[in-house]
């Protein structure tokens, strides 16, 4: 995906003092693209079951370690499709690397990448791009970047950015049969209702762009049961294992995005709640 020189990035960012994110993004064609690379041949045989992994890559920092995990972890076999979030392209914090492309090259995957944010804080960033991706052992027929309704303006944040949450929607060719895959990143700095509105946008896009095709939805949905802007609630939940348990056992009560998907015929997996780690360990 073609970069934008830093002076132009800063000029576009300054427009956000007066204009909306949607208006400024409309001036940047990269936000409408889904960068797609189909360089891997289709596997010879179609398995009875596909292995699909959801993975927040945390900007692609510690990229080698994340790649080693994908390569060596026996619990994620077979691995056919990865719905990945938070992949940098040209950011100093991740070594200036195109992290999605490097992972695809390492594993011989096809991929589609959608731009979520252009980072403005570090003027030394070669590109400052940050986004989501669908990786696949199977050919990608078509791909789109689906922009989600804004629930938080990231320009007025310490992580000053142009952009907003998005999903990458791809049509895969599984031995001649189509399968849709969506890598979704819902907003953490909003409430459950805000995430529901964003999820419904993805559901409508899948219905419109991939009619009659089975679709797998995944990604960092940020279904945390709280509004990430509310520091008091975050501290209350962090200090109460009992409250954490109640929230985990009834996520759909707080997160309407999940029943919204079920209402459209999707099955939520896993059905049993499980604790996941929100941030990486210091060694990646």
For the regions a protein language model found, what residue spans apply to each?
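Acidic-and-aromatic substrate-binding clefts and catalytic sites of carbohydrate-active enzymes
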Residues: 59-64, 89-94, 191-193
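Stable alpha-helical elements in mature extracytoplasmic
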Residues: 62-66, 99, 103, 113, ...
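Active-site-proximal loop/helix segment associated with metal-binding centers of metalloenzymes
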Residues: 161, 179-188, 242-246
């Amino acid at each position: 995906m073609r970069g934008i020189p830093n002076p132009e990035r800063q000029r576009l960012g300054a427009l956000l003092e007066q204009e909306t994110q949607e208006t400024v993004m409309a001036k940047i064609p990269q936000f409408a693209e889904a960068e797609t690379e189909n360089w891997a041949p289709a596997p010879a045989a179609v398995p009875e079951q596909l292995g699909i992994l959801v993975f927040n890559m945390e900007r692609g920092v510690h990229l080698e370690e994340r790649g080693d995990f994908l390569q060596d972890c026996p619990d994620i076999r077979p691995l056919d499709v990865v719905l990945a979030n938070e992949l940098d392209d040209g950011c100093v914090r991740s070594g200036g690397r195109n992290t999605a492309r490097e992972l695809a090259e390492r594993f011989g995957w096809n991929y589609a990448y959608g731009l979520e944010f252009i980072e403005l804080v570090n003027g030394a960033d070669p590109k400052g791009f940050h986004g989501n991706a669908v990786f696949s052992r199977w050919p990608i027929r078509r791909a789109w970047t689906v922009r989600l309704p804004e629930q938080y303006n990231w320009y007025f944040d310490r992580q000053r950015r142009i952009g907003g949450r998005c999903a990458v929607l791809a049509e895969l060719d599984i031995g001649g049969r189509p399968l849709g895959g969506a890598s979704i990143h819902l907003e953490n700095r909003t409430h459950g209702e805000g995430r529901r509105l964003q999820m419904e946008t993805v559901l409508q896009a899948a219905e419109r762009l991939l009619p009659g095709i089975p679709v797998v939805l995944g990604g960092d949905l940020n279904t945390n049961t709280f509004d990430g802007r509310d520091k008091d609630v975050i501290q209350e939940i962090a200090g109460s294992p009992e409250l954490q348990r109640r929230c985990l056992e009834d996520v759909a009560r707080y997160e309407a995005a999940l029943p919204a998907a079920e209402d459209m015929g999707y099955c939520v997996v896993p059905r049993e709640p499980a604790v996941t780690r929100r941030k990486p360990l210091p060694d990646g």
